[in-house]
């Protein structure tokens, strides 16, 4: 009898070839790091292969942070970029000493600072800036326009950077941008 369960076949040879191509492309740039978006597919076997190829993990939930750790990603190659982070998710990431939180707002920055202080930690953060740049992709997955709800408005950036630099349990590392998905025209990024 055939089991009544889904079956997924992954071409791991193709995955490895793709990862090798990525490694070759970034080899001339030692300070350039590629992170795999865990939300694309969090199959543990695939994550192990991706981790073994040296990529980092881009996570959007505490569960994904934990899956990345479980798959062997070094904590210093994990970035947590999700919106609406709960206290337990922030604490999970702090406990593992991940590389960086991408922060969406002043209240989120203040919560991370407070939880880091409580845990005796310094949280590394980048600020997600909404640059008001149009990405030429499907309208439902554009995230970098002023009318989108994601990130810190460009006009507020300086104020939030100054706050991040003043908070005692925050280490301000830089800026983060995400203007949309499935972008095929690289000119969209030139506007950044």
Task: Please name every model-derived segment.
Residues 131-192:
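Active-site loop/helix belt of alpha/beta enzymes
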Residues 68-73, 130-131, 138:
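Nucleic-acid-contacting surfaces of polymerase cores and analogous helical-repeat interfaces
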Residues 37, 124-130, 176-178:
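Short beta-strand segments
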Residues 1-123, 162, 166-172, 187, ...:
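A charged N-terminal "starter" segment
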């Amino acid at each position: 009898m055939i089991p009544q369960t889904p079956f997924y076949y992954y071409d791991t040879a193709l995955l490895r070839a793709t990862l090798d191509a990525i490694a070759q492309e970034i080899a001339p740039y030692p300070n350039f790091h590629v992170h795999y978006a865990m939300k694309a597919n969090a199959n543990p076997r695939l994550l192990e292969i991706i981790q073994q190829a040296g990529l980092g993990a881009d996570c959007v939930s505490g569960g994904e942070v934990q899956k990345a750790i479980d798959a062997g990603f070094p904590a210093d190659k994990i970035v947590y970029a999700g919106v609406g982070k709960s206290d337990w998710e922030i604490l999970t990431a702090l406990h593992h000493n991940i590389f960086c939180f991408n922060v969406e707002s002043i209240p989120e920055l203040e919560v991370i600072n407070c939880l880091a202080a409580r845990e005796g930690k310094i949280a590394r953060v980048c600020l997600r800036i909404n640059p008001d740049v149009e990405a030429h992709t499907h309208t439902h997955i554009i995230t970098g326009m002023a009318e989108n709800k994601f990130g810190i408005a460009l006009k507020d950036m300086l104020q939030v950077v100054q706050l991040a630099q003043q908070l005692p349990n925050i280490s301000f590392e830089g800026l983060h941008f995400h203007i949309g998905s499935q972008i095929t025209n690289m000119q969209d990024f030139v506007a950044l």
